[in-house]
Amino acid sequence: INFITHERTFMGHGIQMHVNENILGLRNRIALNAKFDKEYLTSYQARLAGAEIAKRFLGTNFLEWRVYNAGSRTLPRWPTNTTREKILIIPSSRSETGNHEDWETPWNLSIDGLDLLLKAVGANKDQVVVRFHPNWLQTVGKSIGRSSHKLYKKWCETNGYHYIDSHESVSTMGLIANCDVAILNGGSAAIEAGALGKKIISLGPSAYKGTGFCRFLETIESIDSFSGFDDWISEEQIFRGTLRYVYTALARVPQYFDYVRAITTTDHIALEGADPSRLENMIKTGAVVADDASIGSAH
């Protein structure tokens, strides 16, 4: 029996629906990400995606569940002195995805994956800056953020890595702008990094898996065979891939995007004209179809 689960969407409008998986599942997302990763956007779609990205830089993305780092100061320079690539590590909270099978990694702790990667690329400690997640000083449901804070603090101090603490009012976007490589474990800061043309590595699964603007290292073997930061796609390809992903997350994955409109994170209005057969077909076929399947052209 096919079933549908639903949740509020990442960026606000529409309804997030999954077929035959719970709301944390990645199968439906990955399929749509991959399907549209190489497809051109129309000018309208590109403008809509660009406007959504701009909101994150301006701190006006109020329809997302949480807005972090608003009004924080930008450091005048990179926090360390290095002549090699500046590596920014931006761990996510992972409080929402803990123990879900689609988000599992082969390493016991996220810092174990980071150790493997930093060793594989021969990173020096002066290359690395770690930006602690703001909600590590908060409790989210049964997830106590301080455990992550304690883990990363000890890891940074043991390895001599510079870190920006959770409570510090330092702009994460400013750090991204000054880095050469951004390493994440599924966090949405990949959007800002992609919009700035940065080299992005995701250590493990994420909502943007299936896209090409980010390099995914999800196994020990993939880290061992990683060739470093030189063999990379161009900045233009990163820009294009980021725009395509954002549009997919904004208006393809959510269902009824034009008819369920967010006023705040918890209040929505429903407009007339939505076609209920879309929901019926999802139940019949067991597949999520893009709410907007239109694509642009090269001209």
Identify the role of each PLM range.
Residues 1, 87-95, 269-270, 274:
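P-loop NTPase catalytic cores that bind/hydrolyze ATP
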Residues 81-82, 104-105, 141-191, 195:
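Donor nucleotide-activated moiety binding/catalytic core segment of transferases
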Residues 1-3, 7-9, 14, 167-215:
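A donor-sugar binding/catalytic signature common to diverse glycosyltransferases
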Residues 56-152:
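Conserved catalytic-core segment of nucleotide-activated headgroup transferases in glycan assembly
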Residues 1-39:
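Active-site and donor-binding regions of nucleotide-sugar-utilizing enzymes
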Residues 25-74, 212-299:
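Leloir-type glycosyltransferase catalytic cores
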Residues 4, 129, 162-164:
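General small-molecule cofactor/ligand-binding pocket signal
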Residues 13, 18-24, 102-106, 144-147, ...:
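Short secondary-structure boundary/capping segments
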